[in-house]
Amino acid sequence: MSFYPPSLVNLIKQLSKLPGIGEKTAERLALHILRGSVKDAQALAESISEAKETVRLCSVCYGLADSDPCHICRDATRDQDVVCVVEQGTDMVALEKSGAFKGRYHVLQGCLSPMNGVGPDNLRIRELVERLKKEKIKEVVVATGTSVEGESTANYLRQVLEGSGVKITRIASGVPIGGDLKYTDALTLKRALDSRHCL
């Protein structure tokens, strides 16, 4: 790639650091940006900077937000008795798009994965337990993925939350085994939520 100007090489290098973006895709993206207007390139750079500066984790649910608490946690019309536990903020967005869940959320920021060095202390499980002590929550809906890690996380949560006096349910199958919630269509997510069961 030494035949490209150093600034273009650097842009390709930075783009290739993004997940799922290899060197060839980064090169195509960089060339596309250069073919566009300076105004479009500046708007892209500004939107990246703005998102990096303003988006943070909500101190209640740990979802992505530009205010604290986030708009979902502040919404008094939502069911305050039910909290849906998800792995990532993208899972929360997928459930919101389905329109099937009207409660609040708790984002773990991952799932248990001993092979990758992710244990309970690396997730927002302690915060969930504290939240259950402070708030009048009647049901926790565990909506982790159906991968081995997602199922392990669900089982761990069941063990940790047993005896808390809170009903613990798991979304039903319907989400494909090994699938991520963010790639599941809205109808499948709605059916999975409607058919949730006790752990």
Swiss-Prot record:
PROSITE patterns: RECR, TOPRIM. Belongs to the RecR family. Gene3D superfamilies: 3.30.60.80, 3.40.1360.10, 6.10.250.240, RecR Domain 1 (1.10.8.420). This is Recombination protein RecR. GO terms for biological process: DNA recombination; DNA repair. GO terms for molecular function: DNA binding; zinc ion binding. A zinc finger (C4-type) spans 58-73. May play a role in DNA repair. It seems to be involved in an RecBC-independent recombinational process of DNA repair. It may act with RecF and RecO. It comes from Desulfatibacillum aliphaticivorans. Keywords: DNA damage, DNA recombination, DNA repair, Metal-binding, Zinc, Zinc-finger. The lineage of its organism: Bacteria, Pseudomonadati, Thermodesulfobacteriota, Desulfobacteria, Desulfobacterales. Signal peptide: none annotated. It comes from the Bacteria. Residues 81-176 form the Toprim domain.
